[in-house]
Every structure is written in C-alpha cells, then in structure tokens.
Amino acid sequence: GVGFKAGVKDYRLTYYTPEYKTKDTDILAAFRMTPQPGVPAEERGAAVAAESSTGTWTTVQTDGLTSLDRYKGRCYDIEPVAGEENQYIAYVAYPLDLFEEGSVTNMLTSIVGNVFGFKALRALXXEDLRIPPAYSKTFIGPPHGIQVERDKLNKYGRPLLGCTIKPKLGLSAKNYGRAVYECLRGGLDFTKDDENVNSQPFMRWRDRFLFVAEALFKSQAETGEIKGHYLNATAGTCEEMMKRAVFARELGVPIVMHDYLTGGFTANTSLAFYCRDNGLLLHIHRAMHAVIDRPRNHGIHFRVLAKALRMSGGDHIHAGTVVGKLEGEREVTLGFVDLLRDDYIEKDRSRGIYFTQDWVSMPGVLPVASGGIHVWHMPALTEIFGDDSVLQFGGGTLGHPWGNAPGAVANRVALEACVQARNEGRDLAREGNEIIREASK
C-alpha cells in the first residue's frame, strides 16, 4: 500500500488540540482572528497554528521523516471576542525548537511571516506573545537598561526631559548644533535627531555629529549636568550604520539612536551589541509602527513590537503619550509600558496583557512620551508614566515665544514642580494647572 494519502486535508485533525497543557518552554501567541463566513473557528485556529509552524496545505512525503508531534504549533484554546460578531482569540503554543536562539528576526518570520495572507481569514492580528525565560535568556536585551542609565547620567527620582530638534529637515549642521546647545543649556537632559534625519544633502551626518558634540560639551561644562543628544545612526546599510555609531563613540557622546522597524531587527540587534560593548546608550524610534499596529483587526499589536524590541535591544523606546486619548487607550498603553520596564508582569486582559510575562532580570527599557505634548500636560504625564520615563517636547520647547532656551527652562521648571508636588502628596490630576501656574512665577 501507499505510505500516505495525498490531497487537501483538515488542519484541525492535527493542529487543534484543546487538551494540550502548555509547557514552560513554549512560546505562546494570542491571535485575534476574523474568519471568512462559513468556516468553523477551530479549523481557522488550527490553520494559523499549522501555517506558522510545520504545516502546509497537503500531506507531503517528507512528513514521514520528522516527528510532527514534537515540532508542530498547536492551537490549544479558542474564545469568542466579547461584543464582536465572528471574531475569536486563538491561542497557539509553539515548541521552543522551532526558533533560532537570539534572533528576533527568526521569531517574527516564524510566527507572523506567512500566515497573515491566508485566504480563509478576513483579518488576523497578533495581540500578544509569551516569551519563555528559556528563549529570552538567549538575547542580550537592552544594552544598559534603566538603572545603569541613571547611574551613567547621575539623574535620579524624576523623569528625564528631551526635545526633538525642529525644523527637522533643512537646518545646516551649525545651526542645528546651536539649537541643541540652547535646549540643553536651558535645562533639558536630552535633545534628539528626528527619525528621518539621517545624512541628507543639506546636512551630512558627520558634520551634524561634530557640531552636536560641541554643543553637548559646552552645555555640560556650563550646567554641571551630564547631557545627551540622540545621534541617529540609522543608514542605508548595516556597515554605514556601524560606522556612524563608531564615530559617535570616538567623539565621546553618551547616546545614539536607531529607527528599529525601518532599519530592521537584524541591524538593530547588531547595533545593540555594539552599544553594550562600548558604553553607548541606545535610543529607539518606532517609525513605521502605525503601518503595522494601527488596524485593530489586522497586523501586530504594539505590545508585541515592544517585547521584540526589549529582546533585540534598546534603552529608550517611543511609546505614545496617553494624554488626551480615551481612557481604554490609557490602560492598554500602560500595559505595554510595564512590559517594557518591569521584570514580572501579570496577565491582565483589561490592559491587553494576554499572558504573564517573566523577563528574568533582563534590563528594562525607558518608555518615551513624545508627540504633541507641552508644558500643561506635565502633571498628567508625571502621574501616568512615573519616574522611569523620558518626556519629549519638540514644538513644546522650540515653540516658546521667547525662544529655545526659555522653552527648555519652562519644561524643566514645570517638571521639578510636578515631582515635588507629587512627593509632597498633592493630587496632580486635580491641582495640576495650579502647580504649573505657581511654578511659572
């Protein structure tokens, strides 16, 4: 007789295993599935598990040469999404052996690489991943982490202040350096290259690096505080990116920056290794994230991209602002902020956290609040994000009617006032505006 039967077969026979007990070493994923009408949810969940692990659409001769039971992804639970017609959360467990050690690139290729174009699904969204310690221990993670960064900068007990230099495109290197100096001299801890400032005709990277370094050292000498500017090392090739990081180190600056999604996880992990070996902090911008995470029913939720970044490596990452958004958003944002900086995060569906995540002492990442915030948001930001955060005001610094340095002074004064008021037990939510008004005198 024949060894196996060819032909299209039901996935759920092999890949839907509701009796499966998940292992501590499994990578677990939660997918939000919107099936095409008329397709049973179990079959869809099983299909997702199969296509992102060992399955293909038919039985193949080589299946006989391996142990499917050892290597297959399993859909072990399916629950309907409350309040949504025809939408389910499918839980899939992947055996650890399916993944290359220390490669975020391979992890994402495996889990979300192919299955999102699946005809039988109208939409699919990876909501969360549980990274087991057995896997996370194969990554270096953030080059330094929150505690080491505070020690390097000698700044404690308050959020850090940043500012993106605007106009982001068109300034010459010397004028750019001047804006950096004014902001740092006024009281900010950091200034920042915009994510799309790389090396353009109006300002080549090397000139910018030189003038910025001069601004850093001058402001440091005058304020007696350690200052930084996120020099964007993102480039068209990995070699060029490393060249820029090396030059930053030679100048003796404390921090460089990378656009991790457009630059890619492979480049990002290389840069993180270099930063750890050479004492550079690494600021991460998430340009392109909304392309991937904005649709609610399709794509990858930002909490997954955030976990991936913590594994790949970065000391700061942009994480939204929360201010002025809906309450529900606030809880979800704080969920992934905790996933970035805490060591142990309990499962909590109200905050979008589908799995308990234990990072087993991998360093944390500072969340950066940036985009459309200004000095009147300071009380809310201090309360929501707490001390371990970077608050970045671009237009909210440079837009000050008296100029850049007074804008920086205003932000620093407001921050110190809010931190002091909080430490004295005042209610920032209620008295915020009053606190800012008093401080501005």
From Swiss-Prot:
Active site feature: 166 (proton acceptor), 285 (proton acceptor)
Gene name of the encoded protein: rbcL
GO biological process: photorespiration; reductive pentose-phosphate cycle
Modified-residue entries (N6-carboxylysine), positions: 192
Function: RuBisCO catalyzes two reactions: the carboxylation of D-ribulose 1,5-bisphosphate, the primary event in carbon dioxide fixation, as well as the oxidative fragmentation of the pentose substrate in the photorespiration process. Both reactions occur simultaneously and in competition at the same active site.
Binding site for Mg(2+): 192, 194-195
Principal cellular location given in the protein's record: plastid
UniProt-recorded name of the protein: Ribulose bisphosphate carboxylase large chain
